[in-house]
């Protein structure tokens, strides 16, 4: 039976909110909050993959296993691919990528992403989505939208409003029932991860700044389904951080 590991990519120099991995949330750095949330699961191991000695030292101080990676990776998946190679995981194993800025991610969704990849043998990656309930989220580029086929394989991810509803110019007229927000959790087959860094980086990945588009561009399948539980958005801005702080202080 394949082992299932969780890897949390943690980059110190984030663009929109610098040093957010170390941002204080109710007395603990965010990376610790994420680690402690993930530790409630029953997976074989939890590893933090970081390019920062500072994050490494702090993470090890609260008992995390850490892999130090290069600082020139284009995406979290590239960072995880390096970590997986260093850790020597077996090709048949599964790695779940839990973003280091999602301290409120439900454990059920992590388990769901892993099980989906087990069930969908044609896919090399699995991920989750949820229905959009606020029309403003359709036009917010920080909310990545996804469309998928009848067999629950992703067709495209975009920061734009997809699908485009032709003939409707006013937001109030749009039927939002067919719009889905991508949840940034991924499960990968280790054999694929070891190959990921060799794949062609496509123009669409650069335009959208979405690493999962490299998978689709190179002809691989991403399985997707609606999440078991609603997932709060990750921390990308100071406003997001303040919202999470309020939730932890309740």
Curated annotation (Swiss-Prot):
Give, as one word, the top-level EC class.
transferase
Task: Name its cellular compartments.
Answer: Cytoplasm
Q: Which GO terms describe its cellular component?
A: cytosol
InterPro entries for the chain: Cytidylyl_trans, KdsB, Nucleotide-diphossugar_trans
Per its record, the protein catalyses:
3-deoxy-alpha-D-manno-oct-2-ulosonate + CTP = CMP-3-deoxy-beta-D-manno-octulosonate + diphosphate
UniProt pathway annotation:
Nucleotide-sugar biosynthesis; CMP-3-deoxy-D-manno-octulosonate biosynthesis; CMP-3-deoxy-D-manno-octulosonate from 3-deoxy-D-manno-octulosonate and CTP: step 1/1; Bacterial outer membrane biogenesis; lipopolysaccharide biosynthesis
- The entry's keywords: Cytoplasm, Lipopolysaccharide biosynthesis, Nucleotidyltransferase, Transferase
Name of a matching Pfam family: CTP_transf_3
GO terms for biological process? Answer: CMP-keto-3-deoxy-D-manno-octulosonic acid biosynthetic process; lipopolysaccharide biosynthetic process
| Signal sequence interval, chain numbering | none
Primary localisation category: cytoplasm
One MF term from GO for this chain?
Answer: 3-deoxy-manno-octulosonate cytidylyltransferase activity
Question: What is this protein's function?
Answer: Activates KDO (a required 8-carbon sugar) for incorporation into bacterial lipopolysaccharide in Gram-negative bacteria.
- Name the chain's protein: 3-deoxy-manno-octulosonate cytidylyltransferase
Taxonomy, top ranks, is: Bacteria, Pseudomonadati, Pseudomonadota, Gammaproteobacteria, Thiotrichales
What gene is this protein a product of? kdsB
């Amino acid at each position: 039976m394949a082992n299932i590991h969780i890897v949390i990519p943690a980059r110190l120099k984030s663009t929109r909110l610098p040093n957010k991995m170390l941002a204080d949330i109710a007395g603990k750095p965010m990376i610790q909050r994420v680690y402690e949330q993930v530790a409630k699961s029953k997976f074989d191991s939890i590893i933090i993959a970081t390019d920062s000695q500072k994050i490494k030292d702090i993470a090890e101080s609260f008992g995390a296993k850490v892999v130090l990676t290069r600082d020139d990776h284009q995406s979290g998946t590239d960072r995880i691919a390096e970590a997986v190679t260093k850790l020597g995981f077996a090709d048949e194993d599964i790695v779940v990528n839990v973003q280091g800025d999602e301290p409120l991610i439900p454990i059920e969704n992590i388990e769901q992403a892993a099980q989906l990849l087990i069930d969908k043998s044609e896919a090399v990656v699995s991920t989750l989505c949820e229905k959009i309930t606020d029309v403003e989220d359709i036009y917010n580029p920080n909310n990545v939208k996804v469309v998928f086929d009848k067999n629950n394989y992703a067709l495209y991810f975009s920061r734009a409003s997809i699908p485009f509803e032709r003939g409707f110019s006013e937001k109030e007229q749009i039927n939002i029932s067919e719009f889905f927000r991508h949840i940034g959790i991924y499960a990968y087959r280790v054999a694929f991860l070891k190959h990921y860094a060799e794949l062609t980086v496509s123009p669409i990945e650069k335009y959208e700044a979405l690493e999962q588009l490299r998978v689709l561009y190179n002809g691989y399948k991403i399985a997707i389904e609606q999440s078991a539980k609603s997932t709060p958005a990750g921390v990308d801005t100071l406003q997001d951080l303040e919202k999470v702080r309020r939730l932890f202080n309740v």
